[in-house]
Amino acid sequence: MTNGPIQVNSEIGKLKTVLLKRPGKELENLVPDYLDGLLFDDIPFLKVAQQEHDHFAQVLQDEGIEVLYLEKLAAQSIEDSNVREQFIDDVLAESRKTILGHEKEIKKLFSTLSNQALINKIMAGVRKEEIQLESTHLVEYMDDKYPFYLDPMPNLYFTRDPQASIGRGMTVNRMFWRARRRESIFISYILKHHPRFKDENIPLWVDRDCPFNIEGGDELVLSKDVLAIGISERTSAQAIERLARRIFKDPLSTFKKVVAIEIPTSRTFMHLDTVCTMIDYDKFTTHSAILKSEGNMNIFIIEYDDKAEDIKIQHSSHLKQTLEEVLDVDEITLIPTGNGDIIDGAREQWNDGSNTLCIRPGVVVTYDRNYVSNQLLREHGIKVIEIPGSELVRGRGGPRCMSQPLIREDL
C-alpha cells in the first residue's frame, strides 16, 4: 500500500515504480575535445546504447515494475504555456555562460518545437550551426571553435544522481560539476507541475537551490529508520548535515539515523553506490578496497539528541560493524567486486560491478560483463538478472545509476 507518488523506505523492497531516461541525441554531441568537461571517458554508440537501455527497461517491466521516463514526464509538465515559458527562461539563465547573449535567437528556435521536441532539444544541446548568426561579441571571435550554444547533457540517463527518493519525499540535488548542474531542473518542474505529483505535497528534503553539493548516487536508503550517505567528491558534509537536520525534524519523515561514510576522491569511487550497494536484508556488494580499509574508515553516525535539541555524532572505523549496528542485523555479509582479485576486481569495478539495482530482496539487475562478480553473488544466494551494457557502461554507471526508484513496497 502506498500513500503517494513517492515511497522509498529501503534499498531492497519490491520495486513498483522507477524513473528512467532513455539515451538520446545528447550522446551524439559528445566529441573527444570536450569529453572531460562533460564527464565522459568515451563516446557510446547511441543506437546500441538505446537497444541496451530498452532491454533494461523491458527486464524491469517483465518483473511487473512501472517504468516512467524523465523526458516524457518533463514534456507533460510544461503543457501550460506560462510554465513552458518560465521553464525556457530558467534553462537559458542556467546556460548563460555558453549562449553568449543569444537568448532571443534560441527562443525563436524553441518556439518552433513541440513540448516533447523542446525537452529533447534542451537535453541534447543546441549546436551553433543550428542558429545562423553573425558574431556580435568579442568572445565569439575568440572562442568560435566551441560548437555549442547549449551544452548537451549526456549524463542524464543516470537518473539516480540529480534527485533521490527518500521516504515520502525527495532531494532535488545541486550537482557538483557544472556539466550536470542543470539536470535537476527537470525533476523540479515535474514535481511542481506534473499532474501525477503537483498536488501531493511531496516533501523536498533538499532543494536544488541548496548551496551545498549532494548527488543521489551517494544517497542510500537502508531502512525506514536509516540513511547511508557518502561523503565524496560530489557530496559535501555540509549537505549531509543539512539533510539530516531536515529529516530528523519533519513529522513526515521516519528516519532516525544518517550514516555518513567517507569514500576516496577518485573516478573509481565516484559515489557511494559505485563501491557499496545493499542487495538483501544482510548482504551488500562492496569494492574490495573498502574491505581493505576496514578499521581505518571514517564513518559518522548522526542522530538527533532530544535532550540537547541538536544532532549528535558518533565516529566509527568499521563498515561491517556499523551496518550490523544500525540495521540491527547479527551478521552482515560484504561481497567483494570481482571476488577481491587484484585484476578481476579492478576490471569489474571499473565496469560498475558493485553498482547493482535490487528489485526485491535477494534479486538484482547487473551488467552481464561482470561475470566474476555475478557468479559470486549467485554463490551467496542472490538471483542475478543480467543485462548487456557494453555501450551504457562507457558513461561509468551501472543499473543502480540508471534508475531512480519512486515507489518500493515496505519491508
Swiss-Prot record:
Domain of life per record: Bacteria
Cellular component terms (Gene Ontology): cytoplasm
Keywords: Arginine metabolism, Cytoplasm, Hydrolase
EC number: 3.5.3.6
Extent of the signal sequence: none
Biological process per Gene Ontology, one example term: arginine catabolic process to ornithine
Catalytic reactions on record: L-arginine + H2O = L-citrulline + NH4(+)
Entry keyword Hydrolase: yes
Cross-referenced PANTHER family: ARGININE DEIMINASE
Protein name per UniProt: Arginine deiminase
Gene (UniProt): arcA
